[in-house]
Curated annotation (Swiss-Prot):
Its EC number is 1.1.1.85. NCBIfam families: leuB. It comes from Caldanaerobacter subterraneus subsp. tengcongensis (strain DSM 15242 / JCM 11007 / NBRC 100824 / MB4) (Thermoanaerobacter tengcongensis). Its cofactor is Mg(2+); Mn(2+). Binds 1 Mg(2+) or Mn(2+) ion per subunit. Catalyzes the oxidation of 3-carboxy-2-hydroxy-4-methylpentanoate (3-isopropylmalate) to 3-carboxy-4-methyl-2-oxopentanoate. The product decarboxylates to 4-methyl-2 oxopentanoate. The gene is leuB. This is 3-isopropylmalate dehydrogenase.
Amino acid sequence: MYRIAVLPGDGIGPEVIEEGLKVLKAVEEKYGLRFDIKKYPFGGEAIDKYGEPYPEETRNGCLSSDAVLLGAVGGPKWDGLEGDKRPEAGLLALRKSLGVYANLRPAVLYPSLKDASPLKNELLEKGLDILVVRELTGGIYFGPRGKEAIGYGFRAYDTEVYETQEIERIAVIAFEAALRRRKKITSVDKANVLESSRLWRKTVEEVAKRYPEVELNHMYVDNCAMQLVKNPFQFDVILTNNMFGDILSDEAAQIVGSIGILPSASLRGDRVGLYEPIHGSAPDIAGKKIANPLATILSVAMMLQYSFGEEEAAQDIRKAVERALEEGFRTADLGKGIVLSTEEMGDKVVEYIKG
């Protein structure tokens, strides 16, 4: 039995989570799996109920589960709160308590959605499938920082710091992911300038020796940003640090044309993971039944693959999503086609899973 903590969260979170759970029920029945699913308050919902975004009840539930499935957090209702009391602070606390350090963000462009991409159609005939593996807990976002007054103003600094062990563990996750894909890794750094990047490159090369079947190449981050829009098909897995990954994963997401179909996973060394769509809580459309549930449904597929090792069930979900899109079914954010509500899109995916 697989234990799943579900955090519906705020805005459209509860709506898209319901469709994700509907898909879980379908694969549970089809593949004879068993899921122990428990919902917990989180984000703004938890603030309204408990006065904090990540209450002890939720924390204990997440820490005793095999995986966490999150909807979305935040909204203007809570914007006036202090930083550590806002819904988004709960997300940082959740990641820290779970000990996740690797963020995996697939950017998949289905041929049927190529008109939604800002790239030229002739670049997109083959579709697109990139996985960005970003280190989450080190680098310039977490290094020493400060601000001090000087004679004519201020001086501020942030420090990029990485240790061998931090680089090694994220590299292992990237190489393991590459084994399930096209067996190609592009490690992105700035080794021509930064000492931390030189350590990054050296460490990744050492890890690569354990994976002779995976092709490794290196690329400077500025060139990678250019190549993503010039020739995105050259990439399979992109491995990079915290700040570079923050930027490149958003760039890759925009190539796809809609964040409504993009899932993500945050992992640590074992099978425990946090799964969530990359879109926000979209309070402006909450309750209107037009939110796109596909990113959450595809996050469920990632959970089945990475936390539970249920590769066949995960692929079944992805194929059902692809079929729905190929047959012209859309939610409002995806443009022209047979426009479905949030619930109807979930039902369509379930229909194709059941066959």
